[in-house]
């Protein structure tokens, strides 16, 4: 996976780290998460539902936004995770196999 190319396309050029098969980008706060959502919504495609949001555990404390992006014949899964309970926000990017 050419993560630099994907991040550039998503306008999310920020340093992250690998965890298992995902590249994780920690976001500073809910404002940065909102900006990331806007960039993802503009540049990525969710095949089934544009702007589809899943509320984890049927509550609004943790929200996961799911996007897909195709690049060079590969499909990438992108998750924007906002956990309002413990104030953590991050993006996970991985190649769909």
Residue ranges and their predicted role:
Residues 1-22, 26, 97:
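Mixed-charge, Lys/Arg-enriched low-complexity segments
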Residues 17-18, 22-92:
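Acidic, low-complexity, intrinsically disordered interaction modules
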């Amino acid at each position: 996976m050419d993560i630099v190319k994907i991040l550039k396309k998503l306008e999310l050029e920020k340093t992250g780290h690998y965890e298992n098969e995902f590249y994780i980008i920690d976001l500073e706060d809910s404002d940065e998460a909102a900006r990331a959502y806007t960039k993802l919504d503009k540049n990525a495609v969710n095949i089934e539902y544009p702007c589809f949001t899943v509320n984890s555990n049927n509550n609004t404390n943790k929200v996961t936004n799911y996007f897909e992006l195709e690049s060079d014949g590969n499909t990438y899964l992108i998750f924007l995770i906002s956990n309002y309970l413990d104030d953590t926000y991050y993006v996970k990017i991985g190649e769909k196999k």
